[in-house]
Amino acid sequence: MICGLFREGKLKFLWPFNFLANSILKFDYILVQDEKSKKIIQNLGHNNTCLCGDTRFDRVYDTMSQDDSIEIIEGFKGNKLCMVAGSIWEEDERILVNYINTCEQDFKFILVPHEINKQKISKLRESISQTSILYSEFSEKNNKSDILIIDNVGILARLYKYADMVYIGGGMGPSGLHNTLEPAIYGVPIIIGKNYSKFSEAKQMIELGGMFSIKNDQEFKDRVDYLSKNKLAANKIGLINSNFVLDNKGATNKIMNYL
């Protein structure tokens, strides 16, 4: 078994009679993502258990290492501060739009809805008091807006390299927090919503000080204003996140050594 991830509450009832628990013990080797999983499996009686880590750290590092520049985004950002809001839902949009509509700073915003839906994107644009532009419509002549809305799929992970700070969607509602490792490797501060308890990497980055959880509009404003006005502090905060990814990569090589 590769990259196993187990939780105590999920497996308490499995042993000794459950089919799944017995099946787990039939593996010659079980490679797990974290120390808690290793202890759980060892407590079931499996001795060939190894902590290999999470291959997602390797994937985001590999993505960062590729030269995937996006000319349109470079032209849009210019020399201004830029926030990328990735995989946002309606609950996230309300907080973002409220800030955008009252923002007095010289800021660029790249908004990436979780669901690329024409009607929902139109509704989002209507809620923003400033003029916005769609990625599909962007050109050298049509580039005067400070708000760019991404209306195609497949480029989100590549957008984070242009961010000075990032908001990750999904945490303000029940949808589930989106990938926070993708922006972390680029060394930027990350803001998320209030619901993140099921995401160990988010909890770790918050404990380290590289990520911030907000519950409402005011907390979001306070955090963004601080990061935008304190560039040196923002850079140090972002470095915490990139170091977190670098410190945890290497699972792929460990797994290959067992194959």
Mark where each language-model region is.
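Short hydrophobic/aromatic-enriched beta-strand-loop microsegments
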Residues: 1-2, 48-54, 106-112, 132, ...
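Short active-site oxyanion
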Residues: 25-29, 81-82, 108-109, 146-147, ...
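Catalytic binding pocket for nucleotide-activated donors in carbohydrate/polymer assembly enzymes
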Residues: 27, 43, 156, 161-238, ...
